[in-house]
Amino acid sequence: MNCAIIMAAGRGSRMKVNKNKQFILIQGKPILAYTIDKFQRSPLIDEIIIVAAESEINFCMQEIVYKYKFNKVKNIVSGGSERQQSVMNGLKAVKSANIVLIHDGARPFVDNKIIENGIKYAEKYGGAACGVQPKDTIKIKSEDGFSEKTIDRSKLFCVQTPQCFKYDSILKAHINAEKEGILATDDTMIFEMSGNKVYLYDGSYENLKITTPDDLYAAETLLKKNSIQ
C-alpha cells in the first residue's frame, strides 16, 4: 500500500494574503484541490492523508475533500508548530503502508511520472526525492557582500517533493530526530541523519511550489498551458 501525505498546514507569509496559500483559488479552484487531484488520479496511490491547521480541518473537509469527491482521502490531521511536527502527525495517522510520499500542498504541478518514479526508487533504495539542477550560477557570498567562490552547479540539486520513503524507515528516522531534538528543513535531511541514503531523481521545473505572488502568476500561466482541470 502506498500513502500520500499532503502538507497543508503552513501559512505562507510570503504570499502576503490573509488566508492559507493552499486555499487560494486559481481559475475558481483551490491550489490544494489541484494537488490532491494528482494523487487521487494515480493508480499507485491507495490512500491520502492531509495535514492541515486545526482551525482549517473542517473547511478542508467540506470545501475540498467532499466538494471534489476525493475518496482516497482517509484522514485529515492537525499540524504542529513546525513542519517536522506536522509530518510526524501525518506519519502517525498512517494505518498501513509500504511507501509514503510526503508532498507540499502548494505544489500542484507534480505529474504521474514523478509519483511513479518516487515509489519505484523508494522501494529500491529506501528513500528518494525528486528535484532539478539549478539553472543559475551559484556563488558563496562573504559576510561583507563579496563573492568568495563559484560552486559547480552540476553537483547541486534543488530538492522538490514528493519525498518518498519506506514507511517504517522514515517513521523511525522522525522518532529518532524527535528524541535527539533535531530540527531539520525537510524529510530527506531527517532520513540522512539516521544513517540512510536518499536517491535523487529527476523532477520538473514545472513542479514549482507556490510561495510568492510571482509563483501564483507562474502557476496561472502553467494552468492555462497544461489545461489542468
Curated annotation (Swiss-Prot):
InterPro entries: IspD, IspD/TarI, IspD/TarI_cytidylyltransf_bact, ISPD_synthase_CS, Nucleotide-diphossugar_trans. This is 2-C-methyl-D-erythritol 4-phosphate cytidylyltransferase. The lineage of its organism: Bacteria, Bacillati, Bacillota, Clostridia, Eubacteriales. Gene3D superfamilies: Spore Coat Polysaccharide Biosynthesis Protein SpsA, Chain A (3.90.550.10). It comes from Clostridium acetobutylicum (strain ATCC 824 / DSM 792 / JCM 1419 / IAM 19013 / LMG 5710 / NBRC 13948 / NRRL B-527 / VKM B-1787 / 2291 / W). It holds the Pfam family IspD. Its EC number is 2.7.7.60. It is an enzyme of class 2 (transferase). One of its GO terms (biological process) is isopentenyl diphosphate biosynthetic process, methylerythritol 4-phosphate pathway. The record marks R14, K21 as: Transition state stabilizer. Catalyzes the formation of 4-diphosphocytidyl-2-C-methyl-D-erythritol from CTP and 2-C-methyl-D-erythritol 4-phosphate (MEP). NCBIfam families: ispD. Keywords: Isoprene biosynthesis, Nucleotidyltransferase, Transferase. It comes from the Bacteria.
